Amino acid sequence: MSNKTMVAVAAALVVAAYGGGTWYSGEQVHKSFQEAAAELRHAVGEDAVVRDSYEKGFFSSNANLVLEWTPDAPQVPVEEHDGDEVEPASAAAVTPLKPMRLVMNSDIRHGPLAGAKLAAAVVDSRFALEGIDDKTKQAFAKASMPTLTVVRHLMGSSDWRFALPAGEFADDGVAARWADMAYDVVVGSDKKSVTGDFKWPELVITGLPKSSADDYADEDQEDEDGEEAPAPVRASKGEQMAIAVKGMGGSFNTTMIEGLWGVGPGKMQMRVANAQVTTQQADGPPEVVVDLKDITGDTKMEADAKTLSISNHINGVGRIGPLEFESLGYEEKIQRLDIEVLRSLQQMVLEGYRAGGLSQALAPAEDQLAEWMERSGPKLLQALPSYNMKLNAHYQGSAGHLEYGFGVLKAPSAEEVAEKGWMPVLLKGSVLNASARLPKAWMVNIAKASGQELGPEELDAMIQMASSSGYARVDGDFLTADLKVQDGQMNLNGVVKPLPMGLGR
């Protein structure tokens, strides 16, 4: 066989192999799309996915996925006349909201060198919202939809990059602007191991109304003598709040638990260069009320065959109100959460979404929540869960802390719950701890930060009152307090006291 013939045969084999690899890659991507669409239908309901089409080609394909939902209608207040509820005329005039659609178009290149990369396929997805009104379009006129790029490797792993371009939002005096955000994720070939990182240099929101829900006190409030209370004092008109977060970033790695979406053992680290909250009166200068810097945090999840435990740590420095802290710390531990109970909780949320949209998913009906608690509560307690939280700070050269925790030591039986109720049996079989240690020198500035001026004599009187009543102890330059509730008894600073009426019975 001549050299030319050998070269031709080799070239033909390469072309055949590449063509076969391209066809196989296309088949695998098509199969993955069908599986993802089926999982999505299962999660959000058959009616929510109105289209999932796939046009397959040899070197490239196109996929189209469309989700549809109808936004929740605004709540119309019900008027009362002489104690009878009357539906206002405006309720009948409420226009039914039109369905909205989220459209995802994906261009897919497949083959051993898809997209000039050694990969089985490269998927570029673009998103669009349909059905939004003109007001919403105008509010997001300077914003772009995110993009998603997925690289599927030959051995089954994949790289995901979610990118949100820089943009702006403005509506009814509230405005926001943000820098480019990027989220990079690597999913292992087992579809369980996930690693990733994200970067978001800046997010600023301005014009938020401050305390709008508390502008008016209850006008029907009566004083202790049964007389109508004085006219309520309205909060400052035009007071607004702004939030600015800069230098956000982080990374994570986890191994997903079967049947538990987005949760599994692993670690996450995050950082924020600066977080600032500013308030401003209508005609006054802005006032910085929170200014925290060098914020770092980490989360660790651990799991065994039946339970999941979570620990969080956050640290930073900066100012809250007039108090300039040398350091601030937050620690949290949630231990022994039953995995089956978490699965059932996620299932309840999904069922709520299918039945009534996002609002019902986030706030399930009272009877639905009660049924879930009755079914899952005993199993949750059998794992003996616990929760602990600690706040610590350094201020003016001194350290102080606040902490509390709760843990189940003995799971109650169904008979005990039926006889005495949840609260008494929980108190009998659980332990509650709380403690505080604060420098006395902090009290003046803490009171000032809350709008009260305390002189030395007033401070001494306040400390003496707290000490003589048994609620606090004086330990040199510190005020301390310790509380423990266990076996149906309350121990406050070493003194056993009866539980509040009704809790222990």
Annotate each language-model stretch with its function.
Residues 1-6:
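Positively charged n-region of N-terminal signal peptides that target proteins for export
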Residues 7-9, 17-505:
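Glycine-rich, small/hydroxylated-residue low-complexity segments
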